Amino acid sequence: MNFLDYNKNDNFNCYINKTQYVDCYLNNYGLCIKKNKIKNTLLHKVREQLTVKPIANLGSELESYEIFYEDENYIVLPKFLKPIKVIDGVNEYFINFNIKKYKFKHKTININFKGELRDYQNNIILYVMDLFKNSVNKPKGGIIKLTCGGGKTILAIAIACMLGLKTLVLVHKEFLLDQWKDRIQAFSNATVGIIRQKVFQTDFDIVIGMIHSISAIDYDQDVLNEFGLVIIDEVHHLGSRMFSKTLLKTSAEYTIGLSATPERQDGMMKVVHNWIGDIIYQMKKKCDYRVLIKKIYFKSNDKLLFKEKKRWINGDLRPNHTKMIENLALIKSRNNLMIKLIDSLKSMGRKILILSSRIEHLNIIKSGVDKLIK
């Protein structure tokens, strides 16, 4: 694959000061570096830093994976990659990436926004567009953090209309695909296509793509390069080993991530930030004083289930939180207390939503509540 329109007369250098600079192109693939223009020692450090390993269950490590791409001639790095800190014995230095050329290929579109935005949404759009305008020859993108119900979808559609670039929307659930299609058709005059498994409808203004499909299937990369704007809904999901492959294929000139909770317990949010950018706007959540959170203290005498469980992880005996949570859900006296609380709330005529991370636990609670109803 030819990542660069490389001219042999271009002077691409790697020079040393306190910071070691590496020249690169920024284009549809990311930060592209010709491998014969970077020292092997630096190339090794870059590969090392961009091979990540998720953390799970308080210290246990999962399989590592790469968040860069390379072939015989080029290495492609995340477009928002910050200077890499290297500690080599007693020496410490940074590898910084100098964008020598900025070159994107994409298609333009002419679509209009038909909705009406709230004042705070208009303010966000003005802020984001101004940020893009001032990012000359720099990566353009970032994450917009809004609470659930904050109008992330409508806001993103409005930005797509203003930029006037062929747009790809990435989602990880079928219902989100349907929701985005409905919203795009309701709030703009854009034509809408779908990328999902064998369906590859790209001759449209806005295309909605399933992350599962794009990460697993090698679609025509030249067609994917036509998108000038990529919007990622629930962007925090793209930090995983499988989903992060999507980032290597969809690095457009403009990238916008949307999330109410841009966090990951496995530490892999850094993967998302490297490719999509940092949080560029976040709305502070207003405190709802109508909500009462009440703690219920419970003491269990169940010596079989209510005790610490451990397992071996990398040669160390560590707490097995997964097993302990499973056991908590099986303590009969605890579940009976919950059922009695639900029954008392039911008698007040309230609608009740019960949440649990275990389906088996919900089945136990439902069975107990059903007996009370009968």
Regions found by a protein language model. Give the residues of each.
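Conserved helix/coil segment N-terminal to the catalytic DExD/H
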Residues: 196-229, 240-245
